[in-house]
Amino acid sequence: MGGWSIALHGGAGDIPFSLPPERRKPREEGLRHCLQIGIEALKAQNPPLDVVELVVRELENIQHFNAGIGSVLTNSGTVEMEASIMDGNTMKCGAVSGLNTVMNPISLARQVMDKTPHIFLAFQGAQDLGKQQGVETVDSSHFITEENVERLKLAIEANRVQVDYSQYNYTQPVQDDAEKELPLANGDSQIGTVGCVAVDSHGNLASATSTGGLVNKMVGRIGDTPLIGAGTYANELCAVSATGKGEAIIRATVARDVAALMEFKGLSLKEAADCVVHERTPKGTVGLIAVSAAGEIAMPFNTTGMFRACATEDGYSEIAIWPTA
């Protein structure tokens, strides 16, 4: 086995190269901060499962990302957050959806995994578990920010749902198929799903993903993030966290397909991740981060950009948005 490795993302989408510094830098700093937390946790020999939960909790606490405190609003002006987490060593996993009072959805997903015989709990049942387990909760109004109220207003006026990191009004019509070509505009939506994958020096793997979903989504809509095998997956070969257009990710079972290509076709992590992103999903829809048991890292995307960061035990680290080669 190689040394430890970690990767995290803050969402993929049509991120313009002209993204203003005041919108770009807070996210880069957020990624840098969370990456360092993950590095220190791995150096302290914390289990990868604990590391990915810790890092995603921190990302959920940064308002510049579409998760936790930064979660976007439904067409009714409410928040419905979702998250999932998976341990590659045991294949245990937990997922939650429809949360509007839980400060850190990823930690409730961990409680589902650790404290129940189930994998996926949603809406009031999930929040009731959170109360039983002492998960931090707040009034739902805590998540209704002026910025997201304005974003929802613009989306409703255009009768559209806005996807991760689409340009200002780069949205998709509510009734259109998600795979159709979408109109472009200028700017940046300032939203992005978050995720983290990690492996320790013994090859133990874990993955975690959290999101607020789509701006102006229908109440009750569930995306790829809490679906094991779509937005999140980990086994003994790799750990994967996906981001982008949820419906496209679900159709392609993105996260599981990376692992399946490694398992059944013998592809390397990079080959498998590139195949899924560039050959199996529509252009402009998907990005992912992945690590292998050997410590390899892959961070492909078929969108304009993806906020991402990674580090390895040998000292390599990277924080990037757009293609680097």
Curated annotation (Swiss-Prot):
EC numbers: 3.4.19.5
Disulfide bonds: none
PTM summary: Cleaved into an alpha and beta chain by autocatalysis; this activates the enzyme. The N-terminal residue of the beta subunit is responsible for the nucleophile hydrolase activity.
Catalytic function, reaction form: Cleavage of a beta-linked Asp residue from the N-terminus of a polypeptide
Positions annotated to bind substrate: 221-224, 243-246
UniProt xrefs under Pfam families: Asparaginase_2
SUPFAM superfamilies named among the record's database cross-references: N-terminal nucleophile aminohydrolases (Ntn hydrolases) (SSF56235)
GO terms assigned for molecular function: beta-aspartyl-peptidase activity; hydrolase activity, acting on carbon-nitrogen (but not peptide) bonds, in linear amides
Residues annotated as site: Cleavage: 192-193
One of the GO BP terms on file: proteolysis
Matching CDD domains: Asparaginase_2 (cd04701)
Family the UniProt entry places it in: Belongs to the Ntn-hydrolase family.
PANTHER family (alphabetical): L-ASPARAGINASE, N(4)-(BETA-N-ACETYLGLUCOSAMINYL)-L-ASPARAGINASE
Known role: Acts in asparagine catabolism but also in the final steps of protein degradation via hydrolysis of a range of isoaspartyl dipeptides.
Name of protein: Isoaspartyl peptidase/L-asparaginase
Source organism of this protein record: Lupinus albus (White lupine)
Lineage: Eukaryota, Viridiplantae, Streptophyta, Embryophyta, Tracheophyta
